[in-house]
Amino acid sequence: MTELKRVLGFGNILGLAIASIMGTGMFFGTAVGASYSGNASILSWVLLSIVAVYISTFFGELVAMFPRAGGVYEFSKQTYNRFTSFMIGWLAWLVGNLTTALLIVAAIDYLIPDPSQYIIKMIISVILIIILNIIAFHGIEASGFIVTVLAILSISIILSVIFPGIFFMDLSNLTPFFAFGTVPVFITMFFIAESFFGWESVTYLSEETVNPEKIIPKALVYGTMIVGILATILAVVSLGIAPYQDLIVTPAPLSLVFEHIYGAFGQILNYGVFIALIGSAAGGIITMPRLILALARDKLFISQLSDIHPRYKTPYKAIIFQAAISLIVFGMAFGRYRTLLSLLLPLGLIMYIFIILTIPILRKKYPDIKRSFKVPFVKIGPYLVVGFLFSLMVLWIVTEPNAWQILKLGLSFVSIGIPIYLLLEIYYDPDFIVKVNDSLAYFTLLTEKIILPKPVRKEILTLLGNIRNKTLLEFGCSVGTLTLDLAENVKPGGRVYATDLSEKDLMITHNRMTKRGHRHIIIIHDEHQVNRVHPDIPPVDAIVSIGMMGYLQDVKKVLREMKELVPYGGKIVFVDYVDFFKMIPNVAWLSNDATIEKLFREAGFSVFVTRKKGLFWNYVFVYGIKSQRDIPYV
């Protein structure tokens, strides 16, 4: 199996850490913060920088313990249950997409401040997203190099303000300092917190980093310190050069500062800010597919997205998927910087609260695991930070008029993950499959004509041919929809062995057969059907199975056992559901006809594969005969 390639060193990871953590706050945060607390926002930057450096140590310890591509999902998996870890992974993915959209919106606003140039701004943004994803597709070396260069450029832009800007400061602009009082200082910290979002992005590259246990923790801490120091000094210089009353009404705040320092030439530096923000967006575009990869590996996302490109060693399917999602999210969020920021912040803080709490839990759960990097003050520190972040959210809800509505909107996006999780578990988890089938047994009965319509049943019977007086195995009979047809067609001397995972499905099937007097139908409950054919099944003339291929955990074993039951030339007909709602595929091997044919051929069957369109999903038909040779079957 193709694996990710370890090529990233400390310089690449540090550059990525700076680019990912920096966010839009470095370039918009001074004005956003000043709009809430005036010059006292400087104090917000100082306090938040200290907290941010401490939070970076949590990610450092976690990646030192679990240096895997899943990052926050992997940490949650080791700490919480399967559902919670998926939801945190889903939340991290939402936060990542919102962050990328926010960065690109901010970048375009610096490049083209005129809001009337909507079409041009949209076209440039789409082209940029596509280019960045193409770079990510073609290898982590090129991606890492570009992000590192852009991080250096970002620092250069900030330094081009700080050092000459010191000599243009008017200290009278910094007074009065507490023009709005002290409470707004904490509200400000909520709104500039995005300036330090992004630690999780670096952890997604653990499997592509040389010696990640040591390199990534150091890069996270150093990167956060660099961003914190630069952001704080930039805020001091900006507020010293331009009164906060002017900054807060400027669409691109640093442009005003550039103009004070460099005059008309300062407008050129807007292009530098644009490139720097795109560099931060690139960090998310490069790293987020690794989160999808980790979820797909654990069958908590579409399994096909875990594939690694044999040449470029990148999760190319996840990158393509992520590119499409990025374009959709950007299209929905275009031109709404303040709304995006308000939506992103509470979701990000909720995610970080869950991640911070993993440290004290894992210290107790795995006390002996090797930790090359440790969080200081672990007995009280995590709880103080969680309390601090939670209090910022409460303060935001209390003071901002629309905060509660925005939070509910954000949580509604998070809640979409619940049905997705249930759907994925139905696909992949045998125990969950049984529970769901049992709970939905009567619903399945009510909707059987939709789930298995008459034309599909007729096609199956046609493929089976003449089954009069034959013995059949129906592998997965559900509520007996097809069983009723089989029962009539094998008369007068035939039999049908109907097996299923669900006891409730079988109870319904039994009642239906009894009501119609079909005593030649033998019903067998098999809770292990995803891994075997029930041992009580005798030799049969043919095998038919509906909707079971996607559930099989050991396909080859089940097919080999079926081969032993049918005579040479004995027929098999398998039908399964794919492309649910025309967009959600089934398990990976059912997506490729050649793979299906190969699996059946290796088990001793010569089969033909066809696909037919349905209303809510499509059908894949696999039919053929037991054969020692790979002969065409018609």
Features from the language model and the residues they span:
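Helix-loop-helix connectors at the membrane interface of multi-pass transporters/channels
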Residues: 1, 74-79, 103-124, 157, ...
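Membrane-interface loop-to-helix entry segments
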Residues: 108, 121-168, 179-182, 220-225, ...
